[in-house]
């Protein structure tokens, strides 16, 4: 079974843990409890293939930035999360993306931009078009709006990253050459 190392990044309070826990355990965490770093494992089926996802839920606060390079180096796919209710969380993602590309030393990194808390439409300050435009600027990066509370697009975030990783590095042995045996 293929393993995938996924990393969830973004500012504090955007709902990184809520999205991760909703995906892994199927529950919504109401209380905000800042994360230092949590790791989750979940077996899922994506496109008829069994996958083991290792999801790293990271700290949003600035005090743990020293750990970032390490999990950026080890991660294969990245969910960059902002809250649609806080412009600053959207603005913070450009630096995070640049750091990922620098650590990975490539522009081709499986990544998805996630506008979380889309259930709070009346508190929205970051328009959907802003997210779509940023994703376009980022080499047509995948983009979704989600809600951990309302279970909107939660699974899709992680499944999309798995598909991107599969496209970038296909499963070994899946595309076998056709060979023939000729008897003389």
Swiss-Prot record:
* EC number(s) from the headed UniProt entry: 3.6.5.2
User: What this chain does, per the record?
Assistant: GTP-binding protein that possesses intrinsic GTPase activity. Contributes to the polarizing activity of KRIT1 and CDH5 in the establishment and maintenance of correct endothelial cell polarity and vascular lumen. Required for the localization of phosphorylated PRKCZ, PARD3 and TIAM1 to the cell junction. Plays a role in the establishment of basal endothelial barrier function.
Q: Name one GO molecular function term.
A: GTPase activity
Location comes to: Cell membrane; Cytoplasm, Cytosol; Cell junction
Q: Which UniProt keywords apply?
A: ADP-ribosylation, Cell junction, Cell membrane, Cytoplasm, Disease variant, GTP-binding, Hydrolase, Lipoprotein, Membrane, Methylation, Nucleotide-binding, Phosphoprotein, Prenylation
Query: What happens upon changing residue 38 to A?
Result: Impairs interaction with KRIT1
**Lipidated sites in chain (S-geranylgeranyl cysteine):** 181
Please describe, based on the UniProt annotation, the reported consequence of changing residue 60 to R.
In THC11; likely pathogenic
Q: Which residues carry this modification: ADP-ribosylserine?
A: 39
* Disease affiliated with this protein: Thrombocytopenia 11 with multiple congenital anomalies and dysmorphic facies: A form of thrombocytopenia, a hematologic disorder defined by a decrease in the number of platelets in circulating blood, resulting in the potential for increased bleeding and decreased ability for clotting. THC11 is an autosomal dominant, syndromic form. Affected individuals have chronic and persistent thrombocytopenia, dysmorphic facial features, and multiple congenital anomalies with involvement of the cardiovascular, genitourinary, neurologic and skeletal systems.
Residues binding GTP are: 10-18, 57-61, 116-119, 147-149
Q: Where is the signal peptide?
A: none
Q: Per its UniProt record, what Gene3D superfamilies does this chain match?
A: P-loop containing nucleotide triphosphate hydrolases (3.40.50.300)
Cross-referenced InterPro entries: P-loop_NTPase, Rap1, Small_GTP-bd, Small_GTPase, Small_GTPase_Ras-type
One Pfam family this sequence matches: Ras
GO terms of biological process kind: calcium-ion regulated exocytosis; cell population proliferation; cellular response to cAMP; establishment of endothelial barrier; establishment of localization in cell; modification of postsynaptic structure; negative regulation of calcium ion-dependent exocytosis; negative regulation of synaptic vesicle exocytosis
Motif location (Effector region)? 32-40
Which enzyme class, named as a word? hydrolase
> Which family does this protein fall into?
Belongs to the small GTPase superfamily. Ras family.
As its record notes, the protein acts as a catalyst of: GTP + H2O = GDP + phosphate + H(+)
What is the name listed in the Swiss-Prot or TrEMBL entry for this protein?
Answer: Ras-related protein Rap-1b
């Amino acid at each position: 079974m293929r393993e995938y190392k996924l990393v969830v990044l973004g500012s504090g309070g955007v709902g990184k843990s809520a999205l991760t826990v909703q995906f892994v355990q199927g529950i919504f965490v109401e209380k905000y409890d800042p994360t230092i770093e949590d790791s989750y494992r979940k077996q899922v089926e994506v496109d008829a293939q069994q996958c083991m996802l290792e999801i790293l839920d990271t700290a949003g606060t600035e005090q743990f930035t020293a750990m970032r390079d390490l999990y950026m180096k080890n991660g294969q796919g990245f969910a960059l999360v902002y809250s649609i209710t806080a412009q600053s969380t959207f603005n913070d993602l450009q630096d995070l993306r640049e750091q990922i590309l620098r650590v990975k030393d490539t522009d081709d990194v499986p990544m998805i931009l996630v506008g979380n808390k889309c259930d709070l439409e009346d508190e929205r300050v970051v328009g959907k078009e802003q997210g779509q435009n940023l994703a376009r600027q980022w080499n047509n990066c995948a983009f979704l709006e989600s809600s951990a509370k309302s279970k909107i697009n939660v699974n899709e975030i992680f499944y999309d990253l798995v598909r991107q990783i599969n496209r970038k590095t296909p499963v070994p042995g899946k595309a076998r050459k056709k060979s023939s045996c000729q008897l003389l």
